[in-house]
Amino acid sequence: MKKAIITILMALLAFAFVFAAEEPPVKYDDINFAFQPSMTRYDAMGQSGIALPTKIDSFYTNPANLGVKRGFALTVPSFGVTFYNIQKMVEDEEAMENFNALIKGDSDAALPFATKYLENLGSGRNLIAKIDGGIGLKLGFIGLGTNVQVKLHAMNYGTSVASQSIIPEVNVAQTVGLGLKIIDTSAFSFSAGVSVHGVYKAYFKGIGGSKILDIVGGDADADKVLLWGTPVMGGYAVPFDVGVTFGLFDDQLTLSATANNLNGTYHMKSYTGMGYLVNSFSEGAIPVPEDAPEARDSAEFEIQTPWTLNFGAAFAPKLNVIQPVITADLIDMFELVKSFSSDTFRASDLLLHLNLGAELGLFNIVKARVGVNRGFMSVGAGIWLPFAELDVAYGWQEFGEELGDHPVDSLAVKFVLGYDK
């Protein structure tokens, strides 16, 4: 009997050891990990414009746009950066003093500035920054795009810096789009398209606010924390979008419907650190230091990202000197229909699904933009130079469940080198 008990205990211990040797997966259900590259013009116009068939990146939201406006465009490269929570930092006098000191080269101001920034993030879900780089090609009715994107998420279920978690996310994506104009007359046109995105995503287990401050203050080694000291989840998905566009009056008025992020399931694995993830692709790419924690076995899991059904309209009369544009989108129609059947539906809930935008161009060189994104204003501008374009956008987004719960502002700047008229 004793031998049987000992055998069972040893089996349980062995099972526990095997289980413990596996890096547990980490999931963040409050973060939507669906991939979309930065589109500054789109942001300035209230994140509306799925029916607007201009600019090479329009096929990321509606692949039918490749059929509506065929031609040539090349971006080599594009680079964009977005910073969030600007207003809180500007209104914080101490934060601005530290920021000005940093600009003047005072490295001692980095830690107090980072502390104030984390304090101003508040509770709940937030974003700190987003950086995008990419190249793109539109050749007739075919679109190609390669994008690398880094996001810094923030999640705080408490009220202090100590309870704040920073979650870095990295995306590498290759997109192929095809759009065909099936009916083409001056009075009416019909286009349809599909785009496929091969996305590899990696995100870190949340890094505590205190650890971030240790890194900024020089009390912790950033390489050790990011490469070897923080578990990372990595995996792939192959989502695709489909879209149709109806054009009227020589495509000056367009009506569109899109289904975005279909098949948005990410097949993920857990890794003991980013260094081990990189070495899983190319063994020895990053030398493992002697004091690094031993790599644990990967655990496989899945992340579901939602697909959305969207409708849009755009009016862009073809004028020579002044080019006005008006756009309107209804986003995530399934959720809107669900809210209609709810006893708690309010008219203001419609604003959570309605995006509006307008643009006024002069000689197709200088452009001013304004929009409403789910009840919040956005503004922006763009200037086109020979083989280069600069776009800027500032606006607000809702990060809460209901309108007004957690609005966050952002400033986006994007520079494009190439030809994209």
What are these regions (language model features)?
Residues 7-16:
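Bacterial N-terminal signal peptides
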Residues 1-4:
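Positively charged n-region of N-terminal signal peptides that target proteins for export
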Residues 14-15, 74, 273:
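Hydrophobic alpha-helical membrane context
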Residues 21-42, 126-421:
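Outer-membrane beta-barrel porins/channels
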